[in-house]
Amino acid sequence: MTADLPVVAVRAMANSVLRHLDKAAADLSAPGPEALSLSVWDLHMACEKVMKAYLNQQGIPYEQTHNLRDLVATSPKTHDWSAVKTVLGHFPSEQRVMKWRYQEGGVPSLNDLWRFYDVALEVCSIYAARMSRRFLLDNFSVQIRRPPWLESD
């Protein structure tokens, strides 16, 4: 992630978001209910980590919670979070995710799981896009030349 995150632990947390999404996709395509149940946990963790990284970058304290809806409520009012709130309406609560993680209460359907994956991508995309970034180019040079068809003989 290219976000400007000076705290090493927060940067490490943010850098693991893609790994959670990758693992969820692999689990969604793996056979067996165990993998399917764990995929929801990874999707939840991807959302939670990107939200917490954003809040940390903004200097906003947050409670140690797995509740994504509470984290959205903690997000600054300088942005419109209605899209996140809407898509999270299609995502299971943290209690439900925990039950699935521990193989309790059955397994979500494949249709539900892919919908959860879409929700996680949307949430991660919105939060990541709102993070500030800083790019540093050391020892960088550019040489601009006229194209050959514009050079005079």
Where are the regions that the model predicts?
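Long, charged low-complexity segments
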Residues: 1-10, 55-153
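Charged alpha-helical initiation segments
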Residues: 1-39, 141-148
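A structural signal for well-ordered alpha-helices, especially hydrophobic packing surfaces
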Residues: 21, 28, 50, 124-131
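Hydrophobic packing residues in well-ordered alpha-helices of helical domains and bundles
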Residues: 17, 39-40, 93, 113
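Hydrophobic alpha-helical packing segments in soluble, helical-rich domains
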Residues: 39-57
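Generic structural signal for well-ordered, non-transmembrane alpha-helical segments
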Residues: 15-18, 22, 44-45, 118-121, ...
